[in-house]
Amino acid sequence: MEDLFDKDITILNKYVDKEHRTKYKVSYIKGFWSSNNGISINGTQLIKNDELIAKILINDTRNEKYQKIEDFRKNQKTWTLQNGDYLIKGIVNDFKTIANLREQYDEIMKITNISIKDYGAKELQHFTITGAWYEIYGWI
């Protein structure tokens, strides 16, 4: 199963430090990444139909252990998933700011939905993450 979840993904988790400054914790995981750039035709209308989906195995031993959101807010030990955070396809070694990141990487997802699929066989349990796509022209 891990063969399908072979993409390097960088997670940027937003948090507020003790001085009330916004910070990002950078983490790296393995997962599945799917991106579609497309349109649909609805009668006489063309509708932009872009999609970014990432899936992360819950019990993947290659990744650090997932941290629940409430635990992450207290102590940023590993990684979590929350709306408004970012996933980037690939390894980001030189993160400074979100604006800088947008200039250097093509496939960036701002998380809009997290679904926990924790039923069935343990090796199939996963998080499904969807989000907004950023391109050269702005958020879609």
Model-derived segments and spans:
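N-terminal intrinsically disordered, low-complexity, charge/repeat-rich segments that act as generic
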Residues: 1-22, 26-29
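Short, conserved turn/kink motifs that form compact alpha/beta structural patches or helix kinks used as
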Residues: 23-140
